Amino acid sequence: MFKHEKQLLNGMQVKVERENPQYAVLMQEQLGGANGELKAAMQYLSQSFRVKDQALKDLFLDIGTEELSHMEIVAETINLLNGHSVNYEVVGVGEVESHVLSGLTPFLVNSSGEPWTANYVSVTGDIVADLLSNIASEQRAKVVYEYLYRQINDKEVRRTIDFLLNREEAHNALFREALNKVKNEGSNKDFGVTEDSKLYFDLSTPGRYVQDPNPTEPSFSNPRR
C-alpha cells in the first residue's frame, strides 16, 4: 500500500532561481531516462516481489518507494524550470514534447524526447544478480547527476541535484551491504568452484595463454602468463 504525503521527502523544498526551459530538458533525463528515477523505482519494486528474506524485501521496497519521491522532486523541478509560456523555440533542438503535447507538464521522456520504456528495467529473480544490477544503476544515476550539476548554473537546482546525488550514494552503499550478506546465495552458490572459472587468459600481451594444471584465481594486478 502506498500513501502520498504532501510534504516532499526530508522536508525538501524545490526551488529555481529563474525559469529555464533548456535546464528543464536536461532534467528530463532523470525523470524518463534509462538511469532516471522512474526506472529505479520500477526496477526495485519489481525485484522485491521475488525476494524471500523479509529484511532484504523491505530494503528493496523502501528504496523503490524513495525513488518515487525522487521522481516527484525531479518533476517539480522541471515544472518550475518550464515556466508558463508554451514556446518550442526556447528549447532549440532539444525535447519539444512538453511544449507541443503536454502543455509544459513534466513528461515521461528523456532529454532527447524518447519515451520511457520498461526495457530500462532489469529483473532476474536472482538476489545476487539483481543487487549487482542495482549497485551499477545507482552508480550510473550518480554520474548523470554529476553531469547535470556541471551544466546547470542555477544554485537552487544544484542544491536539489546535490541532495539527489547524495541519496544515490546512500542507496549504493545499502545495496553493497546487502550483497555482502548474500555472497553465498543465488547465483553465487557455485561461483568460482571449477578450474575454468579460475583461469585468466592474458590476451593483451605477447606470450603463452594461461595453461596451468593448478590454475589460480583471476587477478588483474598479477596475471599468470
Curated annotation (Swiss-Prot):
Its cofactor is Ca(2+); Mn(2+). One of its GO terms (molecular function) is metal ion binding. Gene3D superfamilies: 1.20.1260.10. Ca(2+) binds at residues 58, 62, 204. Keywords: Calcium, Manganese, Metal-binding, Oxidoreductase, Peroxidase. Binds 1 Ca(2+) ion per subunit. It catalyses: 2 H2O2 = O2 + 2 H2O. Mn(2+) 2 binds at residues 67, 138, 171. The keyword rRNA processing does not apply. Mn(2+) 1 binds at residues 37, 67, 70. It holds the Pfam family Mn_catalase. Its EC number is 1.11.1.6. Residues 213-225 have a biased composition (Polar residues). Residues 204-225 are annotated as: Disordered. InterPro entries: Ferritin-like (IPR012347), Ferritin-like_SF (IPR009078), Mn_catalase (IPR007760), Mn_catalase_dom (IPR039377). Belongs to the manganese catalase family. Catalyzes the decomposition of hydrogen peroxide into water and oxygen. This is Probable manganese catalase. It comes from Clostridium acetobutylicum (strain ATCC 824 / DSM 792 / JCM 1419 / IAM 19013 / LMG 5710 / NBRC 13948 / NRRL B-527 / VKM B-1787 / 2291 / W).
